[in-house]
Amino acid sequence: AEGAIEAEPNKWMRVPRLSADELRELRDIRVALEGLATERAAGLITPAELAEVKRFDAEIVALRPSGDWKAMMAWINRLHFAIYRASRMPALVRMIEGLWLRAAPQATRLFPGYTQTQRGTLRTATIRALARHDAASARRSMEADVGNALDYLIGLAEAE
C-alpha cells in the first residue's frame, strides 16, 4: 500500500510513523470505508460467515487474559476482514487492506493500554447487529470501534 514503506537515502527501507494529522486523515477514511463495508455485509452475511465471525470473537476473548497481544491482533484482523468480505465488495476490501497496512505499525501501540479499557463492547454490538441484519446499527458500531481506536493513536501521536 502506498505510504506503508519508505525508502531511505541509504537504500534501507523503513516503516514511517504517522503524524497526528496523518492519523486523523486515516481515521476519517477508514471510518467511512469500514462503515460502508459493514453496512453492506449486514444485509448479505450468511449464517456460516456469521459463525466464523463469532468464532474469531471467541478467540479474541479467550486470549485477553493471556496478554498475547500479537495473537489478539491477528484474530482482530481476521474478524474485521471476515465482516468486510461479507460485503461482497472486493475492491472496497482491497482499499481497506491497504489502509490497515499503512496503520499496522501504529496499531501495535493499541496493546495493552487501549485494549484493556475496551472490553469488546463495540465489537459485540457489531456482531449482534450483523446477526439481526441491522445495517445501520452495524455501521454505527463499526465506525465507533475504528474511530475510537484511531483516536487513541492520535492522542499518543499528539503527546510525542
Report each predicted region and the residues it spans:
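Short, flexible turn/loop "capping" segments at secondary-structure junctions
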Residues: 6-7, 118-120
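Helix-loop junctions at the membrane-solvent interface of multi-pass transporters
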Residues: 41, 87, 110-111, 157
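Short acidic-aromatic low-complexity motifs
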Residues: 130-137
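Acidic active-site catalytic centers that drive phospho-/nucleotidyl reactions
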Residues: 34, 76, 134
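Short linear motifs at protein or domain termini
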Residues: 1-43, 48, 150-160
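Conserved amphipathic alpha-helical segments that form helical-bundle/coiled-coil interaction surfaces
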Residues: 26, 47-108, 119-125, 137-148
